[in-house]
Amino acid sequence: MKCPYCSSPDSRVINSRPSDDGASIRRRRECLTCTRRFTTYERAQLEPLMVVKRSGVREAFNPDKLLRGLALASEKRPVEEAALRTFAYSFEDEVQGGEIPTEEIGRRAMTFLRPLDDVAYIRFASVYRDFDSLERFIEEIRGLKGHEDEAPKSDPA
């Protein structure tokens, strides 16, 4: 593994352990040239999941891109980064190869965010659904509010 600090190709593994619920292996390495330490992750390469964009262009699924979108929507909100990371990195394993339209990725991300935080959900929805007016925001917020009103309420008696 090439050292990210000095680009030396020589390193040794100090520690290995399962990560992401066994979906990957986390390795601590030490460069034999500069002696700095770094972490790498190893995961099985399955058939790549291809994302079909609205324009029709296909590209390989990138969990980091999904994670960035979720993190941006959840910025300064009480949403655990670990939950976002788990969702983004397990997404490809759930779908398992083939093709998926960006609309489906967005829909699943919104389904994931909704119970976690309303503000993060609205932020993500505003980009995913391409809100073009204040009315669209209000409509979505009313939909959230209506969903809360339908939930059963506990009887204090």
From Swiss-Prot:
Residues 8-17 have a biased composition (Polar residues). The keyword Repressor applies. Keywords: ATP-binding, DNA-binding, Metal-binding, Nucleotide-binding, Repressor, Transcription, Transcription regulation, Zinc, Zinc-finger. One of its GO terms (molecular function) is zinc ion binding. Residues 1-22 are annotated as: Disordered. GO terms for biological process: negative regulation of DNA-templated transcription. Binds 1 zinc ion. Negatively regulates transcription of bacterial ribonucleotide reductase nrd genes and operons by binding to NrdR-boxes. This is Transcriptional repressor NrdR. It comes from Deinococcus radiodurans (strain ATCC 13939 / DSM 20539 / JCM 16871 / CCUG 27074 / LMG 4051 / NBRC 15346 / NCIMB 9279 / VKM B-1422 / R1). The gene is nrdR.
